[in-house]
């Protein structure tokens, strides 16, 4: 799937910053967190963590989601670098909480990791519901996302 060109310019994300950078320091409840800010049509903050299994996704995700520097709120990705070709990711989605999968979040994490030269492209992003492969050639280029599609719910509605 062509996911489009990621937006890295702070006003377009929207994110309040004086200039564009690959990482930003942001105060969250008295502690400085280092984040990447990316828009994939929706805003994402991506943090690199040592272990996604011990990351405080609910607490820190909620605090960042409504941070004043993101006027439209933000999705928060907790990214663990496995090696140059793999990332593990948990996503706290704005207005929802933690989700099992997030294509735009996987793309935002890939952009953040590639920009910081932590991984190469293509990179596999492992989410709870399965892996996604993200290919990005760099600034100004669209991201290509591929992965399995699975049914997670069947239902009926009477109208």
Regions found by a protein language model. Give the residues of each.
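Helical hairpin unit composed of two closely spaced alpha helices linked by a short loop
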Residues: 104-106
């Amino acid at each position: 799937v062509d996911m489009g060109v990621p937006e890295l310019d702070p006003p377009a994300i929207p994110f309040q910053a004086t200039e564009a950078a690959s990482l930003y320091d942001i105060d969250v409840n008295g502690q400085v967190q280092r984040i990447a800010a990316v828009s994939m049509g929706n805003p994402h903050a991506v943090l690199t963590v040592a272990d996604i299994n011990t990351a405080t996704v609910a607490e820190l995700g909620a605090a960042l989601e409504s941070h004043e520097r993101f006027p439209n709120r933000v999705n928060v990705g907790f990214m663990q670098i496995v090696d140059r070709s793999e990332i593990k990711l948990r996503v706290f989605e704005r207005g929802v909480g933690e989700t099992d999968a997030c294509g735009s979040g996987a793309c935002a994490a890939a952009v953040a990791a590639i920009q910081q030269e932590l991984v190469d492209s293509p990179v596999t992003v492992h989410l709870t519901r399965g892996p996604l492969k993200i290919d990005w050639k760099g600034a100004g280029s669209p991201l290509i996302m591929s992965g399995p599609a699975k049914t997670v719910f069947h239902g009926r509605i009477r109208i």
